[in-house]
Amino acid sequence: MIYAVGIGPGDPDMLPHKTVLLLKEADVISGFETVLNLAEKHFNPNATRVSMGYKDQSEKLEQVGKYSREGKVCVVCFMGDVNFSGYEYLERIHNDCHEPDPIIIPGISSAQMAASKTLTAFETSEFLTFHKRGDISKDKEFLVSALKLGKAAIVIPLPWDFMPAEISRYLIEQGIPPKTEVNVFEHLTWPEEKSYSRT
């Protein structure tokens, strides 16, 4: 059995209770090393840790799939919430682990934290993530359209190609007024959290 869990934006005390219980009992815990480091205080000390990077993630997820077929409880950790910008990684669980039905446990996304800090309601705004592979031109157009309609936008940038400075330049080029208010957050819930309010 494979669980896909969101471990939140960074603060290990913001994990859902169910996720904490699962991490304490899991036989195998896997994910990118930076993500694992954030939640490791909740790990079963006897669990097998399968750390991966971008270059070896297929190989490491194949290992996780093998453990799962042996009857071990496996947890794959996602940054933030699986449903906000994790579906490409989830596809790898389907393909590389050969697991058609991983159990998804949501986490808290940095987008939710940003919305809380700016009192921005999701029902009256647009959420958009550029943090994915492939062409983002349609997403960029959608962002412009939403802002021209007067909506607020909650945006996750694309490291390091389409970050806040590039997003701002693009929006101005597309006719969004330079005086539009922008709030930028870095490392939300981390000790080194930073925020900027600009136009």
Predicted regions and their residues:
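Class I S-adenosyl-L-methionine
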Residues: 1-105, 113, 153
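A contiguous loop/helix-start segment that scaffolds small-molecule binding in enzyme catalytic cores
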Residues: 2-4, 72-74, 82, 147-199
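Short gly/pro/ser/thr-enriched loop/turn and capping motifs at secondary-structure boundaries
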Residues: 36-38, 57, 109-113, 133-136, ...
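Short hydrophobic/aromatic-enriched beta-strand-loop microsegments
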Residues: 47-54, 101-103, 122-129, 177-182
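Short amphipathic alpha-helix with an adjacent loop that forms part of the alpha/beta core around
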Residues: 61-67, 139-148
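Short, glycine-/small-residue-rich phosphate/pyrophosphate-handling segment
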Residues: 115-143
